[in-house]
Swiss-Prot record:
Keyword annotations of the record: Cytoplasm, Methyltransferase, RNA-binding, rRNA processing, S-adenosyl-L-methionine, Transferase
Protein's UniProt keywords contain Membrane: no
Name recorded for this polypeptide: Ribosomal RNA small subunit methyltransferase F
Top EC category: transferase
Native organism: Erwinia tasmaniensis (strain DSM 17950 / CFBP 7177 / CIP 109463 / NCPPB 4357 / Et1/99)
Encoding gene per record: rsmF
Cellular compartments annotated: Cytoplasm
Pfam families: Methyltr_RsmB-F, Methyltr_RsmF_N, Methyltranf_PUA, YebU_pre-PUA_dom
Major localization listed first in the record, in broad terms: cytoplasm
Catalytic activity: cytidine(1407) in 16S rRNA + S-adenosyl-L-methionine = 5-methylcytidine(1407) in 16S rRNA + S-adenosyl-L-homocysteine + H(+)
Entries under HAMAP family matching the protein: 16SrRNA_methyltr_F
Keyword Methyltransferase applies: yes
Length: 478
């Protein structure tokens, strides 16, 4: 059976899908749906703004926002101005008020926190570009700690940029093959999300050529990697903890069989927690085992698979790694030093929760989530928490990323930009406001939300927006 649509379907893939969807009408719905444009969707970042306040803020734009059933913060979006202004160039996106995220990919984190679970230490084993890490951080309210790992070096920078834009402060980043965590950090996490690398069969609506390199042999190779990763994730999970395994592919080899492989290996230590009541209508995509197997035609979305597992008992540990990590190059501040920094930061409108602790490396001051401290020296971190400031004989140079996460828009030194000035800010240009500036160090705000920190130099605001984030092209002033 051949298809001459814009989407490339390998014959063996079509045969596989016919076996998965033996009803001819349903199979045809799958084929038809897979060739339709994917609906755009976003998730409101509640670290920055409530859903109600966001809806009020964007109401003048006349965006058509349809709630996503499995994510209270998620909406499908239709815009009349989509051709004139990219969604990623809107002021609300640049300020981290929302994340452009495919609807199905919101499912794994919703499953992770289903039933009121509130883990204190979470690992996102394959984290880039950051949609799920930022979603986890929002669920946790920036409390506790997240270890966000990404194996692909080219994606680590994107992960950090998204964490920063969204004001995430409770995350430590690593850059490893996920197979290291079971041996290196056994029983260290209350929850683990493994959104596993996969063959991507569910993303053809976004990429018509996604299946060009598809083959059953490559599926087998990928599944072997997934099996090793889920085993590592399970060992890193403490007894009583939750493991969510997900992919954006459709075949059972990378989905049900990988999860069932873990169940067969540890039959007395793993319990499946069914997802049929995760949201209204979830039973339409629930398998006999209790997993979610979302085909594109069921909810008019990408294809996705999600399983939620509970670790009910310890298992024999994996062999310990032979390498030594070495002592991290940071030292905690003493109480007097902490009080000095806290007071200085508060004077410019920067405040943080007591779960964040002050550490120093040379002239750099950092805020580490305290939940990550027991892991220091056990794996090498590429970045931990927030860089707060650099120290100088005359004071501190406060950092942009810390301001975005910690600044108080109601502080005395907050300065609200108009839309033209905000555009100039994101373009990396100094600003020349025609009104008085309240202080020498300013929390820069737009729409009553902090978007950076800057110094007053005479009558101008010296732009401190990071060079790597500076935007060109059309921005939000139409």
């Amino acid at each position: 059976m051949s298809h001459t649509s814009r989407v490339f379907f390998p014959p063996a893939f079509v045969e596989q899908m016919q076996q998965l969807l033996p009803d001819a009408d349903e199979f045809q719905r799958f084929i038809t749906s897979s060739q339709l444009p994917l609906r755009r969707s976003l998730r409101v970042n509640t670290l920055k703004i409530s859903v109600d306040d966001f809806l009020t803020l964007v109401e003048p734009y006349q965006w058509a926002l349809t709630p996503i059933p499995w994510c209270q913060e998620g909406f499908w979006i239709s815009r009349d101005d989509a051709d004139t202004l990219p969604l990623g160039s809107t002021a609300e996106h640049l300020a981290g008020l929302f994340y452009i995220q495919e609807a199905s990919s919101m499912l794994p984190v919703s499953a992770l926190f289903d039933g009121g679970d509130m883990p204190q230490r979470v690992m996102d084993m394959a984290a880039a570009p950051g949609s799920k890490t930022t979603q986890i951080a929002a669920h946790m309210g920036n409390r506790g700690a997240i270890l966000a790992n990404e194996y692909s070096a080219s994606r680590v920078k994107v992960l950090h940029a998204n964490l920063s834009r969204c004001g995430v402060s409770n995350t430590a980043m690593t850059h490893f093959d996920g197979r290291v965590f079971g041996p290196a950090l056994p029983e260290c996490f209350d929850a683990v999300l493994l959104d596993a690398p996969c063959s991507g069969e569910g993303v053809v609506r976004k990429d018509a050529d996604a299946l060009r390199n598809w083959s059953q042999s490559s599926t087998e190779e990928i599944a072997a990697t997934q099996q090793a990763l889920i085993n590592s994730a399970f060992h890193a999970l403490r007894p009583g903890g939750t493991l969510v395994y997900s992919t954006c592919t459709l075949n059972t080899r990378e989905n049900q069989q990988v999860v069932n492989g873990l169940l067969e290996q540890y039959p007395d230590a793993v319990k499946v927690e069914p997802l049929d009541t995760l949201f209204m209508g979830a039973e339409r995509a629930t398998t006999a085992e209790g997993y979610l197997h979302v085909f594109p035609h069921i909810f008019d979305s990408e294809g996705f698979f999600v399983a939620r597992l509970r670790k009910v008992a310890s298992v024999p540990p994996m062999p310990q790694p032979g390498y030594k990590v070495g002592k991290p190059p940071f030292t905690p501040l003493n109480r007097v030093q902490q009080q000095e920094v806290i007071a200085a930061a508060a004077s410019v409108g920067l405040r943080w929760d007591t779960e964040l602790k002050l550490w120093q490396r040379d002239k750099e001051l950092w805020l580490f989530p305290s939940e990550i401290e027991p892991l220091l020296g056990r794996v090498r971190f590429s970045r931990i928490g927030l860089k707060l400031a650099e120290t100088f004989p005359k004071g501190f140079r406060w950092q942009h990323h810390a301001a975005v996460a910690l600044a108080d828009a109601a502080s005395a030194n907050a300065f609200e930009l108009n839309s033209n000035e905000a555009e100039e800010w994101y373009r990396g240009r100094d600003i020349y406001p025609e009104r008085d500036l309240p202080a020498s160090e300013l929390i820069i705000c737009y729409q009553q939300r902090p978007i950076g920190i800057a110094k007053k130099v005479g009558s101008r605001i010296k732009n401190n927006y990071p060079r790597e984030l500076v935007r060109d092209g059309k921005l939000f002033t139409l």
